[in-house]
Amino acid sequence: MIALMAAFLLSTNATPRELVESCRSMVPKTVEIDGRIILRNRRGIPQAEYAYVLKRLDGKTDLILKDADGKPVDFERQGRILKTDVTWSDLTLDYLWWDDFSFDAEREAESVHGQVCAVVVMRKGDRTVRVWIDRKTGAMMQAEEFSGDRPIRRLWGTRIRKFGERWMANVLEVETVGSGHRTKITVEELK
């Protein structure tokens, strides 16, 4: 019902707020996600791999990372996680809750994977993220983080899957621009 309402709202001239609210509504308030984070070189050869469990309960999020032997790994929430391209923001999509956002007028109606998207620029302090949102479904299709006026990281979904009643990206790619490698995030289980 919510997705149907979102599709109806977004088929008209939705405001940036309506688009962002639609994205927010697709992120469960309480969820546990199990998956893998795989750092790969330019040729796609794995360089490092970690299992993760992301738990979100009433807006509070916790992340557990494990190495190949299943042992917990310590990491910093600031910056890249364990030399991968992935950041805390990639896993939690925290920028969707920033309050300063507007349309990117220069990128009106761009397509991502054949879907016409609105492009919304989100800001918090000195951080800026550009988000492509599908005009029909209100789903986030990709995001770019900026340093000044140049993109430094990109995130995009490559596959979607239905978990119970919820459709979501189950394979995402994250790239630090110019690094020569990418990191794949997989979602194996959603509880």
What is the role of each PLM region?
Residues 48-95:
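An acidic-aromatic
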Residues 45-51, 151-154:
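Amphipathic hydrophobic-ligand
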Residues 15-16, 22, 26, 56-57, ...:
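Intrinsically disordered terminal and processing segments
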Residues 2-45, 57:
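N-terminal leader/targeting segments and the immediate start of mature chains
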Residues 17, 95-107, 151-154:
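A short, amphipathic edge element
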Residues 113-191:
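Gly/Pro-enriched, hydrophobic low-complexity segments
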Residues 33-37, 52, 61-63, 172:
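One face of beta-strands
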Residues 51-56, 103-111, 131, 158-160:
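Short, exposed beta-strand/loop patches in secreted or surface proteins that constitute
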